[in-house]
Amino acid sequence: MDHIHHLLSSHGFTRTRLAKSKPIVVHAIAGSGKSTVIRKILSDLPNARAYTLGKPDPYSLSNPTIKAFAQFKRGTLDILDEYGQLPFADLDSSFEFIFTDPYQAPTDNLFEPHYTLEITYRFGPNTCNLLNQAFQSNITSLVTQDNISFGSPYLVDPVGTILAFQPDTYLILCLHQAPFFKVSEVIGYQWPTVTLYLACKISEIPEEERHLLFIGLTRHTESLLILGPDAFDSSP
């Protein structure tokens, strides 16, 4: 256990004042490297097993991997990633460490954290500025550059991977036979360039759906195009 606490500290996670208790709760934003830390734990501690409610690792013969939550079996040192996608009542008591991005989860599913990290290696300062304005967060980036642009879905063509937020956008994309993912389907995924379709202004999205908005705004590593009903009113 002490080794895991040391790993978290050495990777930049900040220890809160919350007393140690089971499970140890780790909150880290998208692209912070929490999956890297979990894989390091698996590599260093042979009895550790990790599962996720997001995207599992590909199968590997040589390295321990983060498995899908559906494969969960109780062990001696169980770790869960993206725990925020799971209601409290469904969280198994055997998990020693649980991780999530709190902005990507319904607030009702969140515990108070023992460790936090709001530094990302995925996207750049423009995305951080948008997120901090929309979510009153304090996210910073070690990436020096990224691009965010806005446009009308009727005037601008999508680029890269297409993500859709809200049913109205699903219908439009289906009518145009454009391949897309719903934002609820892409936790743990990332692409260089993403187009996100919105049905309303960011500021008008209901509180209960804002964790899905955060997912949609953080899947890119280089460029994000936001297409909404009013190109000049899609920003917060």
UniProtKB/Swiss-Prot annotation:
Domain of life: Viruses
Domain ((+)RNA virus helicase C-terminal): residue spans on this chain: 118-236
Any one Gene Ontology molecular-function term assigned to this protein's record: RNA binding
Domain (+)RNA virus helicase ATP-binding, chain residue ranges per copy: 1-117
Location(s), subcellular: Host cytoplasm
GO cellular component, one term: host cell cytoplasm
PROSITE patterns according to UniProt: PSRV_HELICASE
UniProt miscellaneous comment: TGBp1, TGBp2 and TGBp3 seem to act together for cell-to-cell propagation. TGBp1 is the main movement protein that physically cross the plasmodesma with the viral genome. TGBp2 and TGBp3 would facilitate TGBp1 function.
Known role: Transports viral genome to neighboring plant cells directly through plasmosdesmata, without any budding. The movement protein allows efficient cell to cell propagation, by bypassing the host cell wall barrier. Increases plasmodesma size exclusion limit. Acts as a suppressor of RNA-mediated gene silencing, also known as post-transcriptional gene silencing (PTGS), a mechanism of plant viral defense that limits the accumulation of viral RNAs.
Family: Belongs to the Tymovirales TGBp1 protein family.
Protein name, UniProt field: Movement and silencing protein TGBp1
